[in-house]
């Protein structure tokens, strides 16, 4: 963060992005017949139940990160492969929709071009885009792994289960060792989407 003011703007934006993301996972899982998110208290718009300390710090420090995954039990689904795909997609889609809505408010000039509220709205757009893109990376526990899993053959499932056991550690080590590479790869994608939503804007 370049200043304390930036941090004040990022925090509410981060809470909005994380809450929308995880609530959407839980809502879709619940709609498909899995009571686990509701039973675990995750079918909630309270951001505190969705926060992951390390993931939240990564959003503040590195501008991408994650929330506490919503527990889902695929045994409740009629079509586990399809329904896990839908649950996995729900979070990033919700983030993109949220980014679009907040960007639309800014583009329509409904807020002053300067000020705390417009600053928060801009960060809501940026963080929602970043959270959506980052979570599409196919490494557990990120959503991209659930999406990829739906398209893999049965023969690949043992490797997937192994990766699910150690995915978080692998992801963390990659983030630490290759943070610069992540930025180089992800920044052009993020800037492209930001420019589509808010022409002339740049990612953080």
Model region roles, listed by residue range:
Residues 1-204:
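Hydrophobic transmembrane alpha-helices and their immediate loop junctions
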């Amino acid at each position: 963060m370049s200043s304390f003011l930036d941090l004040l703007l990022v925090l509410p934006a981060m809470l909005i992005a994380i809450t929308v993301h995880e609530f959407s996972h839980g809502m879709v899982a619940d709609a498909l017949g899995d009571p686990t998110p509701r039973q675990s208290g995750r079918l909630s718009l309270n951001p505190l139940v969705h926060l992951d300390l390390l993931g939240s710090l990564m959003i503040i420090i590195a501008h991408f990160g994650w929330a506490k995954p919503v527990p889902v039990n695929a045994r409740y689904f009629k079509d586990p492969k399809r329904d896990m795909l839908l649950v996995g997609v729900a979070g990033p889609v919700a983030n993109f929709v949220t980014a679009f809505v907040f960007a639309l408010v800014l583009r329509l000039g409904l807020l002053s071009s300067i000020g705390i509220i417009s600053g928060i709205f801009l960060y809501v757009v940026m963080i929602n885009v970043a959270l959506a893109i980052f979570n599409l990376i196919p490494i557990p526990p990120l959503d991209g792994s659930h999406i990829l899993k739906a398209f893999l053959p049965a023969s690949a499932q043992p490797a997937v289960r192994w990766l699910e056991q150690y995915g978080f550690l692998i992801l963390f080590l990659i983030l630490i060792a290759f943070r610069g590479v992540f930025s180089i790869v992800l920044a052009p994608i993020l800037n492209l989407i930001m420019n589509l939503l808010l022409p002339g804007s740049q990612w953080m």
